[in-house]
C-alpha cells in the first residue's frame, strides 16, 4: 500500500462537471457487491415481501463504493457534502405513527391527501425503542421473539411486530430540474418501504446496509413533495440476525437526497499495488458511468497536502472505463505511518 489522500475524477461533458471524491477505504464497499440480491416482483410472490426470502430489494440502486459527487474539485477536497448544492438532508423531525402489531398500521398513509395531523413528531435518524416505542431487548443467543411465537422461517408474526410509518413534506431546489435525484438511507431495521408523492418507489430489507433509490421520475423540483416510509421490527431477514447485540428498530444512520447530472460516474473500484520490487506504485481504477459513452474521464491523485502527484485520462466505452495510474516511489503504508 502507499499513501494518498484523495483521487479526483472529472467526467467531462458539455453541460456540467461531475467531480467525484473518494478515499482509499472506499474499497471496502466491495463487500456490499458480494451480497446476494433478489429482484422478484411483488406480483410474482404469494407471500408479502417481508416473508419472501427471494426478495430483499425492489427498485433499489446497485450497491456501490461510498463517495459523493461534488460540483467542484475544491469542494471535493474539503469532503463536506453538506456544503454542496447537490445535497439536501432529510434528517430532523418527521410525522410519525407507531403501532405494536403490524396489521394495525394505518392503511393508505402514503397518500398525498392523508390526514396525519394527529401523528407525533419523531427524529430521523432515530430508533423506536430509544424514544419510548416498544421494549429495549438485548439478546446474546437466540431470537428476540422466542417468548412470543415459535420460529418458522421465513414466516414472521404480525403481533408485536412494531411498525413505524413516516411522512415528511419538503421542497426540492428548482435548479435540480433536469438532474437525476437519488435518496440515500444509511440503515433501516429491519426493512424499509418507500413512497413518493403517493406512488410506490421501492423496498429494502438489508438492515445495516445503506440503500439508495432513484426518485427522479417521482419528484417535482421547485414544488412541495411528500416522502412516506414504513419500517418494521422484524422480517424474514431477521432470521439471519441471531447475534449478540441490542435489538433496535428504526433508521439509525443519515438520510439525504442528492442530485447528479444525467452523465455521471456511478461507481468506482480502485485496486492499489506496489511494483518494481515494491518501489513504485500503481492504481488500477475501474469506472462505471451512465449516459457518458465517448466522453473523457480525467483522474487526479493528490497527497495529504493537496499537491497533485499523478494524473491520467481515459474515454468511456460501453459505460465502462479501466485506467492505470502510475506513481514513482510513493510513500508506503506501515503500521507506524498508516
Q: In which residue ranges do the predicted regions lie?
A:
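Accessory carbohydrate-binding/adhesion or oligomerization-edge regions at the termini
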Residues: 41-144, 226-234
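Accessory beta-strand-rich segments of carbohydrate-active enzymes
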Residues: 43-57, 80-81, 95-99, 105, ...
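Beta-strand-rich binding/interaction modules
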Residues: 196, 280-315, 321-323
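Exposed aromatic-hydrophobic patches
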Residues: 211-217, 320-329
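Metallo-beta-lactamase
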Residues: 332-338
Amino acid at each position: 500500500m502507499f499513501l494518498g489522500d484523495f483521487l479526483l475524477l472529472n467526467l467531462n461533458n458539455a453541460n456540467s462537471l461531475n467531480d467525484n471524491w473518494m478515499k482509499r477505504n472506499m474499497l471496502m464497499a466491495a463487500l456490499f457487491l458480494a451480497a446476494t440480491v433478489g429482484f422478484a416482483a411483488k406480483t410474482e410472490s404469494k407471500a408479502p415481501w417481508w416473508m419472501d426470502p427471494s426478495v430483499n430489494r425492489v427498485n433499489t440502486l446497485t450497491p456501490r463504493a461510498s463517495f459523493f459527487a461534488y460540483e467542484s474539485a475544491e469542494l471535493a477536497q474539503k469532503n463536506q457534502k453538506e456544503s454542496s448544492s447537490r445535497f439536501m438532508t432529510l434528517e430532523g423531525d418527521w410525522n410519525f405513527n407507531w403501532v405494536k402489531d403490524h396489521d394495525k398500521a394505518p392503511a393508505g398513509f402514503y397518500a398525498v391527501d392523508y390526514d396525519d395531523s394527529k401523528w407525533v413528531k419523531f427524529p430521523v435518524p432515530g430508533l423506536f425503542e430509544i424514544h419510548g416505542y416498544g421494549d429495549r431487548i438485548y439478546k446474546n443467543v437466540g431470537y428476540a421473539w422466542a417468548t412470543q411465537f415459535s420460529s418458522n422461517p421465513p414466516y414472521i408474526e404480525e403481533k408485536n411486530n412494531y411498525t413505524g410509518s413516516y411522512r415528511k413534506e419538503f421542497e426540492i431546489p428548482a435548479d435540480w430540474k433536469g438532474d437525476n435525484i437519488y435518496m440515500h438511507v444509511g440503515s433501516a431495521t429491519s426493512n424499509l418501504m418507500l413512497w413518493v408523492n403517493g406512488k410506490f418507489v421501492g423496498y429494502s430489507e438489508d438492515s445495516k446496509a445503506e440503500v439508495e433509490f432513484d426518485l427522479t421520475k417521482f419528484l417535482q423540483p421547485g414544488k412541495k413533495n411528500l416522502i412516506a416510509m414504513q419500517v418494521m421490527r422484524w422480517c424474514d431477514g431477521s432470521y439471519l440476525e441471531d447475534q449478540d447485540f441490542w435489538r433496535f428498530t428504526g433508521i439509525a444512520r443519515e438520510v439525504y437526497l442528492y442530485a447528479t447530472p444525467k452523465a455521471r460516474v456511478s461507481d468506482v473500484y480502485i485496486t492499489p499495488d506496489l511494483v518494481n520490487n515494491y518501489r513504485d506504485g500503481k492504481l488500477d481504477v475501474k469506472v462505471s458511468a451512465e449516459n457518458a459513452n465517448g466522453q473523457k474521464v480525467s483522474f487526479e491523485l493528490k497527497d495529504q497536502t493537496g499537491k497533485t502527484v499523478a494524473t491520467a485520462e481515459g474515454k468511456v466505452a460501453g459505460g465502462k472505463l479501466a485506467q492505470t495510474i502510475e506513481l514513482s516511489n510513493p510513500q508506503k503504508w506501515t503500521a507506524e505511518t498508516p
